[in-house]
Amino acid sequence: MWGFWLLLFWGFSGMYRWGMTTLPTLGQTLGGVNECQDTTTCPAYATCTDTTDSYYCTCKRGFLSSNGQTNFQGPGVECQDVNECLQSDSPCGPNSVCTNILGRAKCSCLRGFSSSTGKDWILGSLDNFLCADVDECLTIGICPKYSNCSNSVGSYSCTCQPGFVLNGSICEDEDECVTRDVCPEHATCHNTLGSYYCTCNSGLESSGGGPMFQGLDESCEDVDECSRNSTLCGPTFICINTLGSYSCSCPAGFSLPTFQILGHPADGNCTDIDECDDTCPLNSSCTNTIGSYFCTCHPGFASSNGQLNFKDLEVTCEDIDECTQDPLQCGLNSVCTNVPGSYICGCLPDFQMDPEGSQGYGNFNCKRILFKCKEDLILQSEQIQQCQAVQGRDLGYASFCTLVNATFTILDNTCENKSAPVSLQSAATSVSLVLEQATTWFELSKEETSTLGTILLETVESTMLAALLIPSGNASQMIQTEYLDIESKVINEECKENESINLAARGDKMNVGCFIIKESVSTGAPGVAFVSFAHMESVLNERFFEDGQSFRKLRMNSRVVGGTVTGEKKEDFSKPIIYTLQHIQPKQKSERPICVSWNTDVEDGRWTPSGCEIVEASETHTVCSCNRMANLAIIMASGELTMEFSLYIISHVGTVISLVCLALAIATFLLCRAVQNHNTYMHLHLCVCLFLAKILFLTGIDKTDNQTACAIIAGFLHYLFLACFFWMLVEAVMLFLMVRNLKVVNYFSSRNIKMLHLCAFGYGLPVLVVIISASVQPRGYGMHNRCWLNTETGFIWSFLGPVCMIITINSVLLAWTLWVLRQKLCSVSSEVSKLKDTRLLTFKAIAQIFILGCSWVLGIFQIGPLASIMAYLFTIINSLQGAFIFLIHCLLNRQVRDEYKKLLTRKTDLSSHSQTSGILLSSMPSTSKMG
């Protein structure tokens, strides 16, 4: 509509302009001046209009005067171009672009739009201008092949068709089989132009039933060919369905000799498989059967499932321990050693295999070795092995090794040529040279003396046996030297059972019945020998005697004698051998003789009374009856009790009293709640440790039969007594802190220490000491005569070391405590210091010496002339330590006595709970809780 008014405006303007130009002409005609004839009267882009007496200028359409007037005159005014595109209402309309030109404006349609004429429009033209959307999709080829064109306002877009993807400016076919997971498992994807399809693999079919499908909604399922066609593999084979296929195979235990194509009917026949190629376990044999097999363990092995024949691959063949099943597998006097699948027989020590006997299965024969050689003795003793190792280079073993080697030289002469006669005279002379080294013998340790004594006795016995087995010209001999006498007899004639053989040497005699000669099963001509040693009783004396009567005075009162017989059997005879031994000194009426034999099984050799009995004893002789050939001596036990026995009685009586008192103290500390506090708990731990240590000491100190159990007992005693001393140290420290707290205000109090920390100290440190001690010297626990720490190797210091340290600390702390207590008592008023409780307090303070173990220092002073007095004091005080604890902490504690009275009289008077100064050293009241 606005275009119409614009045209109308232009029409009137033209008419006006025309009128204005015609009037001047008329004026000129009428005779006036026409200024408009001068073309410079008006500026450029203006029209001049003449009036009757003047003129005026008007800017052309699309221009405005610089002074803003429509009609103007005069110079200086210009007509300036008007930018119609900047007007508020766009002259071109929507979807168009306005371009200003001189005096006018040009309208152009935006990209994607077009006017009705398809051309630009100049403002002022007669026709209307309207930009309409252009549908580019109507243009052929504007989008590439396999794409769709979509028109939009002012534009368009191209989209590839389904199954195609854009590659640059063209649409290419998309291979869905490569770019996407479009088919299910066990299916094959096939690509087509713009699409795809899926087919199941051979032997499978789709769940939808069709041959082709798209997407994952369907799945490929296995076709069971074996169930659809039962004759697929034929009558002799087994059809096995597999995923997507099937196979034909032979039954278990059979195989097809020719190659079988998977999934095809089998040709040929199935043959039996020999499964015995690496099928059965180790130590077994395999037996093949038609279609199967079974395993059987080798002799000496048994299956783990107990079956004779088996097929289970998890079954193993385990070795049979024939030695455990039958202890007599190898026969008498033998040792059975199990090996995989079998066993080995060997002879016991002092026995050897009989070369004349049968060595068949279960018929192994061992006969006794008639005499020992150096190799046999070396194996019996660690002392000798050590001596052989150092070869005399160690000065500490020089004397011992010298005597050992001298004795072995005698034995080597006997053993080197067992078929040659042995000279008893020469051997006796050599033995005398060893025995005459009395000074050297007395310098040896107890273990070395017993070891050397054993070697010497065994050497003499072996020499006598060798002389009897291969006699020289003299069938019976009598050898006399300064240090030993020997009488030997070879019995060439038949010895009747009721007869006996008498041998004598240095006043000692041995009577051997002929029945013993027969029982001994002699090889060749039987023979017996008897030896009596001079001065050997001073070396192998009563200190090597271990017996429960050691509390009586003992002394050796005979020479050491020995007897032997050529037979294999040397002990457990049906009738005894009679030994008559002459006394070195007359027997006293108060003395009782003990017939002892040298036992090499106890340590390296000890005198023991087992196997022999006293038949009769006179002032000059003792007759012994023994059931074996042995080395014997007579030990006299005096009727006078030794100091050790008195100490033994005192120790045991005092220990029993202490146990009773400790039990009462433990019950008091546990059950009397009124006296329970920080200190009584410490007393309780000390009492428990002492109670356990003393009761184990009473019941287990002499349990030496089992060395392993004895070592365990010794280890527990070590720990318990150490725990006692560590708790004594805790008591001493706590007592000192408590007394010092009375003197100094706000001083560190014993109540500030938690009980858990004290328990860790009192029980933990002893464990650490025992573990370290056992690691350093595992054999230090247990001795031959008591279950305690070894006192001969220095191992006892693993106990004495900590004990001495604790005694020293406790003594210093106790002295300091008494000094502080004395200053405290002197500082109070004279009236208070004269109270009777002061005397009680002082007594209880001094009694702490016994409670805290300080009295153990008496054991160190058991030397010199005061040794016996110190021994009695030490035994009495320390055996009654439990009684002292009960006396100080219970009976002399008024609060505890009140609790005892209440318990006995069943009264419940609560007024008796008064505190007195007597509790000061036994149980300081504490309101703090236990840590």
Swiss-Prot record:
Q: Per the record's keyword annotation, is Zinc included, yes or no?
A: no
The knockout note for this entry states: Deficient mice fail to develop peripheral tolerance after inoculation with antigen because of a lack of efferent regulatory T-cell development.
Specify whether Zinc is a keyword of the entry. Answer: no
Q: Misc remark for this entry?
A: Most adhesion GPCRs proteins undergo autoproteolysis at the GPS region of the GAIN-B domain. ADGRE1 is predicted non-cleavable because of the lack of a consensus catalytic triad sequence within GPS region.
Q: Which residues are glycosylated?
A: 148, 167, 229, 269, 283, 405, 417, 474, 498, 706
The protein's name? Adhesion G protein-coupled receptor E1
Which BP terms in the Gene Ontology apply to this protein? adaptive immune response; cell surface receptor signaling pathway
Tell me where in or outside the cell this protein is found. Cell membrane
Q: Which PANTHER family match?
A: ADHESION G PROTEIN-COUPLED RECEPTOR E1, ADHESION G-PROTEIN COUPLED RECEPTOR
Q: Which family does it belong to?
A: Belongs to the G-protein coupled receptor 2 family. Adhesion G-protein coupled receptor (ADGR) subfamily.
- Motif (Cell attachment site) spans which residues? 506-508
Q: Which SMART domains match?
A: EGF (SM00181), EGF_CA (SM00179), GPS (SM00303)
Tissue spec. comment: In macrophages; but absent from those which are localized within T-cell areas of lymph nodes and spleen. Low level of expression on blood monocytes.
Its placement in the membrane is given as: Multi-pass membrane protein
Q: Region (GPS): which ranges?
A: 595-642
Q: Which GO terms describe its molecular function?
A: calcium ion binding; G protein-coupled receptor activity
Q: Which residues constitute the signal peptide according to the record? A: 1-27
**Domain GAIN-B residue range list:** 482-642
Function comment: Orphan receptor involved in cell adhesion and probably in cell-cell interactions specifically involving cells of the immune system. May play a role in regulatory T-cells (Treg) development.
